Protein backbone atom coordinates (compact mmCIF):
# COMPACT_ATOMS: atom_id res chain seq x y z
CA UNK A 1 0.00 0.00 0.00
CA UNK A 2 2.80 2.43 0.86
CA UNK A 3 4.27 2.15 -2.67
CA UNK A 4 0.95 3.27 -4.16
CA UNK A 5 0.00 5.93 -1.63
CA UNK A 6 0.02 9.49 -2.87
CA UNK A 7 0.20 11.47 0.36
CA UNK A 8 -1.00 9.83 3.56
CA UNK A 9 1.43 8.28 6.01
CA UNK A 10 -0.97 7.95 8.96
CA UNK A 11 -0.78 4.76 10.99
CA UNK A 12 -3.56 2.25 10.28
CA UNK A 13 -5.32 1.81 13.64
CA UNK A 14 -7.83 -0.90 12.78
CA UNK A 15 -9.39 -3.16 10.15
CA UNK A 16 -13.13 -3.78 10.31
CA UNK A 17 -15.74 -5.95 8.67
CA UNK A 18 -18.61 -4.30 6.82
CA UNK A 19 -20.91 -2.52 9.30
CA UNK A 20 -18.83 -3.50 12.34
CA UNK A 21 -18.82 -0.86 15.09
CA UNK A 22 -15.63 1.23 14.92
CA UNK A 23 -13.83 1.26 18.27
CA UNK A 24 -10.52 2.88 17.30
CA UNK A 25 -9.83 6.56 16.72
CA UNK A 26 -7.98 7.83 13.67
CA UNK A 27 -7.35 6.06 10.38
CA UNK A 28 -9.18 2.73 10.03
CA UNK A 29 -10.11 0.47 7.10
CA UNK A 30 -13.45 -1.25 6.50
CA UNK A 31 -13.99 -4.05 3.97
CA UNK A 32 -16.77 -2.82 1.68
CA UNK A 33 -17.86 -2.85 -1.97
CA UNK A 34 -16.82 -0.15 -4.44
CA UNK A 35 -20.43 0.86 -5.04
CA UNK A 36 -20.84 4.26 -3.34
CA UNK A 37 -24.25 3.79 -1.64
CA UNK A 38 -23.41 0.32 -0.29
CA UNK A 39 -19.95 1.37 0.90
CA UNK A 40 -21.20 4.47 2.73
CA UNK A 41 -24.14 2.54 4.22
CA UNK A 42 -21.56 0.27 5.90
CA UNK A 43 -19.67 3.29 7.21
CA UNK A 44 -22.89 4.72 8.66
CA UNK A 45 -23.74 1.35 10.25
CA UNK A 46 -20.24 1.38 11.80
CA UNK A 47 -20.94 4.69 13.49
CA UNK A 48 -19.73 7.27 10.98
CA UNK A 49 -21.71 10.48 11.39
CA UNK A 50 -20.16 12.59 8.59
CA UNK A 51 -18.72 11.41 5.27
CA UNK A 52 -15.80 12.98 3.36
CA UNK A 53 -16.28 11.46 -0.09
CA UNK A 54 -13.67 11.90 -2.84
CA UNK A 55 -14.61 11.57 -6.50
CA UNK A 56 -12.71 11.92 -9.74
CA UNK A 57 -15.54 11.04 -12.08
CA UNK A 58 -18.31 13.05 -10.50
CA UNK A 59 -20.38 10.80 -8.30
CA UNK A 60 -23.36 12.86 -7.14
CA UNK A 61 -23.85 10.60 -4.12
CA UNK A 62 -25.71 12.07 -1.16
CA UNK A 63 -26.74 10.62 2.17
CA UNK A 64 -29.56 11.46 4.56
CA UNK A 65 -28.51 9.47 7.65
CA UNK A 66 -25.07 11.16 7.66
CA UNK A 67 -24.09 14.31 5.73
CA UNK A 68 -21.73 13.62 2.84
CA UNK A 69 -19.31 16.28 1.61
CA UNK A 70 -18.13 15.58 -1.92
CA UNK A 71 -14.50 16.39 -2.68
CA UNK A 72 -13.72 16.81 -6.39
CA UNK A 73 -10.25 15.55 -7.28
CA UNK A 74 -9.96 17.68 -10.43
CA UNK A 75 -10.96 21.22 -11.33
CA UNK A 76 -12.49 20.37 -14.72
CA UNK A 77 -15.04 18.03 -13.16
CA UNK A 78 -15.65 20.48 -10.29
CA UNK A 79 -16.50 23.24 -12.80
CA UNK A 80 -18.96 20.97 -14.63
CA UNK A 81 -20.57 19.72 -11.42
CA UNK A 82 -20.30 22.80 -9.20
CA UNK A 83 -23.85 22.34 -7.86
CA UNK A 84 -23.00 18.81 -6.65
CA UNK A 85 -19.42 19.20 -5.34
CA UNK A 86 -18.57 20.76 -1.97
CA UNK A 87 -14.78 21.17 -2.31
CA UNK A 88 -12.41 21.41 -5.28
CA UNK A 89 -9.20 19.58 -4.35
CA UNK A 90 -8.12 19.86 -8.00
CA UNK A 91 -6.77 23.34 -7.19
CA UNK A 92 -3.67 21.58 -5.84
CA UNK A 93 -2.69 21.02 -9.47
CA UNK A 94 -4.67 23.63 -11.41
CA UNK A 95 -3.86 26.59 -9.13
CA UNK A 96 -0.76 25.28 -7.34
CA UNK A 97 -2.49 25.37 -3.93
CA UNK A 98 -0.77 23.44 -1.16
CA UNK A 99 -2.08 20.14 0.14
CA UNK A 100 -2.04 21.71 3.60
CA UNK A 101 -4.26 24.62 2.48
CA UNK A 102 -6.79 22.36 0.76
CA UNK A 103 -6.71 20.00 3.75
CA UNK A 104 -7.50 22.91 6.06
CA UNK A 105 -10.42 23.88 3.79
CA UNK A 106 -11.77 20.33 3.99
CA UNK A 107 -11.30 20.27 7.77
CA UNK A 108 -13.10 23.61 8.19
CA UNK A 109 -15.96 22.46 5.97
CA UNK A 110 -16.29 19.27 8.04
CA UNK A 111 -16.53 21.40 11.20
CA UNK A 112 -19.14 23.66 9.59
CA UNK A 113 -21.23 20.71 8.39
CA UNK A 114 -20.97 19.06 11.82
CA UNK A 115 -22.19 22.37 13.29
CA UNK A 116 -25.32 22.45 11.14
CA UNK A 117 -24.40 23.85 7.73
CA UNK A 118 -25.81 21.87 4.79
CA UNK A 119 -23.86 19.94 2.15
CA UNK A 120 -24.66 20.52 -1.52
CA UNK A 121 -26.58 17.21 -1.64
CA UNK A 122 -28.58 18.17 1.47
CA UNK A 123 -29.45 21.54 -0.07
CA UNK A 124 -30.74 19.72 -3.16
CA UNK A 125 -32.68 17.19 -1.09
CA UNK A 126 -30.65 14.21 -2.35
CA UNK A 127 -29.99 11.02 -0.42
CA UNK A 128 -33.44 9.51 0.19
CA UNK A 129 -32.62 6.38 -1.81
CA UNK A 130 -28.90 6.00 -1.09
CA UNK A 131 -29.16 3.69 1.93
CA UNK A 132 -28.15 0.34 0.39
CA UNK A 133 -26.94 -2.46 2.71
CA UNK A 134 -24.33 -4.73 1.11
CA UNK A 135 -25.79 -8.03 -0.05
CA UNK A 136 -23.75 -11.15 -0.76
CA UNK A 137 -22.98 -11.24 -4.48
CA UNK A 138 -22.76 -8.56 -7.15
CA UNK A 139 -23.93 -5.07 -6.20
CA UNK A 140 -25.06 -2.77 -9.01
PLM features: what roles do these ranges have?
Residues 81-88:
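A structural signal for small-residue-enriched, beta-sheet-centric alpha/beta enzyme cores
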Residues 7-12, 19:
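Anionic-ligand anchoring segments at beta-strand to alpha-helix junctions in alpha/beta enzyme folds, i.e.
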Residues 47-49, 54, 66-68, 89, ...:
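Extended hydrophobic packing segments that form well-structured cores
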Residues 1:
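Conserved small/polar residues in nucleotide/adenosyl-binding loops
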Residues 15-79, 91-95:
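Hydrophobic alpha-helical bundle architecture
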Amino acid sequence: IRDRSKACTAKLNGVYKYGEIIKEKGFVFMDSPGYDPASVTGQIASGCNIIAFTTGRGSAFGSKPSPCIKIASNSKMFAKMYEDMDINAGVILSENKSIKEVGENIYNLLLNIASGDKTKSEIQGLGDFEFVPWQIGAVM
